[in-house]
């Protein structure tokens, strides 16, 4: 499968005349097409949700585009939580997965209503110590 670049060499040369290097160019049309294709591929599963790893590309414009296609944000830091909130992603549209994390990060995740994903059983006790309780069954499924 051959993929055609979304800009030509000539277009990049023109952009360089205006913007200093280095810079990033994003293919908005391609991002939208891929997000739409992913959403359609899993449309058979009404409970499916894609969570974009904010750490991969912490760009609010990209997060906003992905939000339009139903994507949530996978966050692992206070800054990523703040960025997600700034673009209007809150509640169960945030998956917070983090290790060796300060209490304030977990508190913000809890305040935003994020799903807190733990991969270490000792974190359950830590959350209890900082007064973050396990959700009720109803909260967990809503």
Locate predicted features.
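A charged N-terminal "starter" segment
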Residues: 1-129, 133
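Single conserved hydrophobic/aromatic residue that forms the stacking wall/gate
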Residues: 130-142
